[in-house]
Amino acid sequence: MSHSDLRLTDFRRIVIKVGSSLLIDSAAGKVKSAWLAALADDIAALHRAGKDVLVVSSGSIALGRSRLKLPSGTLKLEESQAAAAVGQIALARIWAKVLDHHGIGAGQILVTLRDTEERRRYLNARSTISKLLEWRAVPVINENDTVATSEIRYGDNDRLAARVATMTSSDLLILLSDIDGLYTAPPGINPNAKLIPVVESVTADIEAMAGAAGSELSRGGMRTKIEAAKIATSAGTHMLIASGKIDHPLQAIIDGGPCTWFLTPANPVTARKRWIAGSLEPKGVLVIDAGAVKALDAGRSLLAAGVTRIEGTFARGDAVVVRGPDGHEIGRGLVAYSADNAERIKGKSSAAASKILGLTGRPEMIHRDDLVVSHHHDNGHNNGSHGVSTPAPEPSA
């Protein structure tokens, strides 16, 4: 794939990361309102074109520091957490206001490292974000600095943005930066430094080009952006770094402005399913009936109605093996219910399952995006199979 083949408007689900130094005027201690309004114009244009847009926004600690009139310098952990508590309110209000100008709702999501590393919490966070996107809102995501400690934090929003992109099967991650891409050397030091327009894969040479640049307002430099690229591209998400120091930075990318693309050979769904199939140890087994086998072969989700037996002890979000009535493995997936709850609702319709559990959560035992079908049957057409859920369109590059 060449640089000319890459068009921002071809992507369906886009995560945009905005750093503190772009959003906050450190001298005045205020948000750069005109710049943010221009960025919101760009986001609204993508939204009108039918794109799913997510924002990962830094700035809560910087805003809190300003609102509390704290002196410059490094903050202790508890000081950062207290500043974030004040700043998170301000940050949410700011994003809600600029997006509301375009008739777009904003939803605040505060996450910690464990929300994307532990599968149960991962599923909860992902389902919340998915519902916001379904309602055509823009999720505004930040690390929950009020509760994150040094041991369980990302420490930068570049890697958080990459995790969000992979969690939501986004096909593009945009890191808006104070530099317009990856250079062969630090451009502020070496006048001969050249912008690299496309990175096919993150090699040791590419990593060596990443300087350690950072600022008091921002915890991340180019090194964390390269780490983000490794996370994103390994999960099937393309990434680009572009300058956010101009008005309408997304439109500038569309118009062919300078940036660096990091390419992935896979799409998000393929990469995610490879991870489920090969990297996770199954904790249990779901045995399903013939109708559900047909449903899975047709690309549907697995509903409780099609499950006949539960084996093993597992929690929500654990990997399980799916077997057909003859005992052969049909596939593997991330189960949406614990073994106890799965046992209670097996063979039941979605309405009955919801009544038994006293909730109206996901009707699927395993969602199709969390399921890898490894053995296909010659089932012809799916006529009246139970255990069936109509598939939703998958994001694709």
Swiss-Prot record:
Its main location: cytoplasm. One of its GO terms (biological process) is L-proline biosynthetic process. Residues 283-360 form the PUA domain. Substrate binds at S58, D145, N157. Residues 374-397 are annotated as: Disordered. Keywords: Amino-acid biosynthesis, ATP-binding, Cytoplasm, Kinase, Nucleotide-binding, Proline biosynthesis, Transferase. One of its GO terms (cellular component) is cytosol. Its EC number is 2.7.2.11. It comes from the Bacteria. It is an enzyme of class 2 (transferase). The keyword Kinase applies. One of its GO terms (molecular function) is ATP binding. Catalyzes the transfer of a phosphate group to glutamate to form L-glutamate 5-phosphate. Belongs to the glutamate 5-kinase family. This is Glutamate 5-kinase. It comes from Afipia carboxidovorans (strain ATCC 49405 / DSM 1227 / KCTC 32145 / OM5) (Oligotropha carboxidovorans). The gene is proB.
